[in-house]
Amino acid sequence: MKAIIVLLMVVTSNADRICTGITSSNSPHVVKTATQGEVNVTGVIPLTTTPTKSHFANLKGTKTRGKLCPNCLNCTDLDVALARPMCIGTIPSAKASILHEVRPVTSGCFPIMHDRTKIRQLPNLLRGYENIRLSTHNVINAERAPGGPYRLGTSGSCPNVTSKSGFFATMAWAVPRDNKTATNPLTVEVPYICTKGEDQITVWGFHSDNKNQMNKLYGDSNPQKFTSSVNGVTTHYVSQIGGFPNQTEDGGLPQSGRIVVDYMVQKPGKTGTIVYQRGVLLPQKVWCASGRSKVIKGSLPLIGEADCLHEKYGGLNKSKPYYTGEHAKAIGNCPIWVKTPLKLANGTKYRPPAKLLKER
C-alpha cells in the first residue's frame, strides 16, 4: 500500500487561524466491493483484457495438428481418413488439433451418401487421438471372404501410383467373380490386429446402384441388408436401389451408383462382426490410434505460436488472468472468461480534502 502523508499545518498570526487535515488528489478509479459497493480508490491494476480476432497458431509447448496429413496435397481430411489413393501419408502426433473443415466434407473416388451414417465424424474421431497410424496389413482377405471368390472393384476417379484406377485402402469393393446370384446374409469376423494396445478404427460400407447395374455386378437388383456389431452395439442398414443422379468425382466418369461408408471402433482384443449381402465394401487396412489430442474448431494456416487457442478469437497470448467478450471453448494456458471487467485495487480508499475550518 502507498503511504499516506498526513500534513498538519497550524498557522498562528494576529489574523484568523486556518487548519487543514488529510489531503489527496481526486481519483478516477472506481471499484465494486462486497461490503461497501462502489468505492473510489487511488490506484488499480486491470485484470481483464478484451481480445481481438486473430489467426490460429501452434499451441506453445505442444505439437498442434492442422490437416490430418500435411504432406497429402489436394486431399480433404476425409480423403485421408478413408485412405484414398494419393492421400496416404504420415499423420503427425499432436496434443492439440484444429477442426478446420466445414460441412459438407467431401471425398473423391466415389460418390458417398454422407447423411446415412456418421462417416463425416471419422476425421474428427481420428483428430481426437494423439497418435494415429494406418496398419500395414489388411484385416481380412477380401477376395476369399464368405460369398466369394471376389474380384476387387475400382474407380477411375481413384488413380494410384501404378494404375489409373483404384479404391480406398481402408475398404475392398467385393464384386463376385462368377457366382453373380442373390445370397442370404453372410457373416465375416473382423479381428483386432493393432499391436500396441490402441483403439482400432475399422472402416466398411456397401455399394448400391440402379437395377441394371445391380444385376450386372451382383446378379440381384433387390435392396440388400447389412449389419455391423462391436462392443455390444449393432447397426443395421438396407441399401437403396436406383434414383441417383449421375455424379462425377474429381474428373472421373459419371457414376450412377453410391456408396455408404461407416466405421466401428474396436477396443484391444475385441472382435467385430459384419453381416452382409451383395455390394459389401469389406474392411482392409485399419487405423490404430492411441492417446488423446484436445480438439478445437479453428482455421488454417497455423501462424506462429500462442499461449491459448480460442474458438472465437484464434491464438491468444495471456497478458491478463481474465478476459471479457465472447465466451467459447479454449485450450492451452488461457485467461478465464468473466462477464464484466475486474480490477485489483493497489492504492488506498480515496478521501476528499478536508474542509477548511475557520476559527475566530
Curated annotation (Swiss-Prot):
Compartmental location: Virion membrane; Host apical cell membrane
Membrane-topology descriptor: Single-pass type I membrane protein
GO BP terms in the entry: fusion of virus membrane with host endosome membrane; fusion of virus membrane with host plasma membrane; symbiont entry into host cell; virion attachment to host cell
Keywords: Disulfide bond, Fusion of virus membrane with host endosomal membrane, Fusion of virus membrane with host membrane, Glycoprotein, Hemagglutinin, Host cell membrane, Host membrane, Host-virus interaction, Lipoprotein, Membrane, Palmitate, Signal, Transmembrane, Viral attachment to host cell, Viral envelope protein, Viral penetration into host cytoplasm, Virion, Virus entry into host cell
PTM statement from Swiss-Prot or TrEMBL: In natural infection, inactive HA is matured into HA1 and HA2 outside the cell by one or more trypsin-like, arginine-specific endoprotease secreted by the bronchial epithelial cells. One identified protease that may be involved in this process is secreted in lungs by club cells.
Coiled-coil region(s): none
Signal peptide bounds: 1-15
Pfam families: Hemagglutinin
GO molecular function: host cell surface receptor binding
Glycosylation sites: N40, N74, N160, N179, N246, N317, N346
GO CC field: host cell plasma membrane; membrane; viral envelope; virion membrane
Protein's UniProt keywords contain Signal: yes
Main subcellular location of this protein, as a coarse class: virion
Note: Major glycoprotein, comprises over 80% of the envelope proteins present in virus particle.
Annotated function: Binds to sialic acid-containing receptors on the cell surface, bringing about the attachment of the virus particle to the cell. Plays a major role in the determination of host range restriction and virulence. Class I viral fusion protein. Responsible for penetration of the virus into the cell cytoplasm by mediating the fusion of the membrane of the endocytosed virus particle with the endosomal membrane. Low pH in endosomes induce an irreversible conformational change in HA2, releasing the fusion hydrophobic peptide. Several trimers are required to form a competent fusion pore.
Oligomer status and interactors: Homotrimer of disulfide-linked HA1-HA2.
Similarity remark: Belongs to the influenza viruses hemagglutinin family.
Protein name: Hemagglutinin
Source organism: Influenza B virus (strain B/Bangkok/163/1990)
